Amino acid sequence: MTQIMTPKTIVHELERHIIGQNDAKKAVAIALRNRWRRMQLDNEMRQEVTPKNILMIGPTGVGKTEIARRLAKLADAPFIKVEATKFTEVGYVGKDVESIIRDLVETAVKMKREEAKEKVTEKAARLAEDRILDVLIPPARTSESKVGFANEPAEDAASKKEKENKTREIFRKKIQNGELDDKEIEIEVAVAPKTIGVMGPPGMEDMTSQLQDLFSSLSTDKKKNKKMRIKDAIKLAQDEEAAKLVNEEDIKARALEAVEQNGIVFLDEIDKVCRKSSNSGADVSREGVQRDLLPLVEGSTVSTKYGVIKTDHILFIASGAFHVAKPSDLIPELQGRLPIRVELKSLEIEDFVRILREPDCSILKQYIALMKTEGIDLSFEEDAIRKIAEIAYKVNEEVENIGARRLHTVMERLLEKISFDAPELVEKNINITTDYVNEKLGNLVKNKDLSQYIL
């Protein structure tokens, strides 16, 4: 997809979901386009060109995570978001940073497996239908004598076979049209191997995962007859047939390549593993996490159960609010590995208005769609939208700035009564006015103590 996506196109796509923050959008758009540019180079030059990792700096709720998440969807690339605070230095209790790459590979394998299954959907559907038809119309057997010669003429056998095929096609059409969905049949299905719980100490998740895989591989493939509706049986049989048709070794190879060439790791809360400049105490584990991240970000080799991964060309996007610590509190080596710095701005009232209205699945559109399921036509006046934005901004200023997430809290409080009474409401056209917003939220905003706990 990135082949035809210029940086301007990428920014335009991001603008459908994220309001403002143009500097951050441009930075990630250039990084994504550089992926494609690198793949056009000759092999020798391609190995030398490494991604320019990004450090996003900005308060919570301004779009840091959303930018990275949408970028991964646009790139159709393996993507993982991790909290830097979840990891500890090697030797301490907790997850070590190499598990980031192992989780990224797992994500890529699932992604490539789904892609492979999609390619064989039609064939798998046909085979699944055949399995159901074999239960509904068991294939006729030609009666044979003890010496192995057929007792009936060949013409009769051919006629029976033709009649059987016609019957099968009639039933196939009925299955495809959903006419037999609720009919129950007994079908042979594969039994999923039982998961064996392995107790392991904290931080040893990789070892316990490998032990579970070992026990699973030792269990033989068992099958059992199960009674279910045809609708469910078709889905189950289709999944089983698709799994047989795909090449697992090819999936693994393509997943490893996708991670190495296009993988994106989003490191959130990077500021929480900074050593505070004012703190003279021992922050061994925090600084240790940064030192462990260094080889990953710079380029190293990580062993996974699917194969070895080189992290040289994986794009790392780190982000943090940096309220207490500063970017300069990161260890110098890690600062050097995050050359592109982008500062995301705090949201203003106008930004809140746009967030409510403009994105493809904006908050207002979501609530309107939810109420539509109850037969209620919900609408908002322009002044009411601005008032909601002003309230969200004011509460952020006075209580705690949580960015755009404040809008969800405000909207839930505003529409609480309508949402609760929706099934019994006689009036199906509801228009939200400024007066209604003031009535529901006015007192809460004025009373700082109340807004602190409710909004």
Swiss-Prot record:
GO terms for biological process: protein unfolding; proteolysis involved in protein catabolic process. Keywords: ATP-binding, Chaperone, Cytoplasm, Nucleotide-binding, Stress response. One of its GO terms (cellular component) is HslUV protease complex. GO terms for molecular function: ATP binding; ATP hydrolysis activity; peptidase activity; proteasome-activating activity. It comes from the Bacteria. ATP binds at I19, G61, V62, G63, K64, T65, E66, D268, E333, R405. Pfam families: AAA, AAA_2. Its main location: cytoplasm. Transmembrane segments: none annotated. PANTHER family: ATP-DEPENDENT CLP PROTEASE ATP-BINDING SUBUNIT CLPX-LIKE, MITOCHONDRIAL-RELATED (PTHR48102), ATP-DEPENDENT PROTEASE ATPASE SUBUNIT HSLU (PTHR48102:SF3). A double ring-shaped homohexamer of HslV is capped on each side by a ring-shaped HslU homohexamer. The assembly of the HslU/HslV complex is dependent on binding of ATP. Belongs to the ClpX chaperone family. HslU subfamily. This is ATP-dependent protease ATPase subunit HslU.
